[in-house]
């Protein structure tokens, strides 16, 4: 198979440098990526740590007006402590304080491995009403630490750099929990601040955490 060598300066990104782009068959080889395309910004793999933080301007993290929508993916999140919770909080001072006031709702579905107790329920104890503490991303006290147990899911954060509007977010997680149940949790709400959110922290309510979290920007 013949190989063709391209010089580095044969790729002209100038026409689309301010947008997402992809290769095509045109002379300059590039085209603007369609809206909704995702750009991987940062991958963090936690190993028995207290928290995972994404701070704008630190370690190549982008969390500003570059994107209107950001996506966090949770992969193989495993706690060191049994029957704990994965949580999130936000900062407006690049992580000096994680105490943004939040309004949220929370409901979940579940089914035991023995095919009992299938249910959908609103969990009032897991929502926040102008609370500044951690927001649960799974039902309280249920994240399992057995070798075969973990949590996965995602969270969207919308327009965090706005200094006009509150900051909406929504999350879905699925876990094999400490009670050997398949449990899915749905969280939605907003950070009730018109200051720009420039840092996000994920942690367990008790003990350390393991797993991988990926941050993506969604092309406007």
Which positions does each model-derived feature cover?
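Surface-exposed molecular-recognition determinants
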Residues: 2-220
């Amino acid at each position: 198979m013949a190989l063709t060598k391209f010089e580095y300066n044969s790729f002209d990104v100038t026409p689309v440098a301010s947008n997402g782009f992809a290769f095509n068959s045109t002379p300059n080889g590039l085209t603007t990526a369609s809206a909704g395309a995702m750009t991987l910004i940062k991958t963090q793999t936690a190993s028995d740590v207290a928290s995972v933080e994404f701070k704008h301007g630190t370690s190549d993290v982008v969390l500003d007006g570059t994107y209107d929508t950001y996506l966090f993916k949770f992969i193989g999140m495993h706690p060191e402590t049994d029957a704990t919770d994965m949580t999130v909080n936000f900062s407006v001072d690049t992580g000096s304080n994680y105490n943004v006031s939040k309004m949220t709702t929370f409901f979940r579905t579940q089914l035991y491995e023995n095919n009992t107790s299938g249910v959908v329920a609103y969990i009032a104890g897991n929502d926040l009403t102008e609370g500044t503490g951690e927001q649960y991303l799974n039902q309280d006290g249920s994240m399992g630490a057995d070798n075969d147990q973990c949590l996965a899911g995602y969270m969207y954060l919308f327009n965090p750099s706005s200094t006009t509007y509150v900051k909406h977010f929504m999350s879905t997680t699925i876990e094999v929990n400490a009670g050997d149940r398949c449990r899915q949790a749905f969280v939605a709400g907003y950070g009730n601040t018109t200051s720009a959110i420039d840092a996000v922290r994920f942690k367990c309510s008790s003990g350390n955490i393991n797993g991988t979290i990926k941050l993506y920007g969604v092309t406007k």
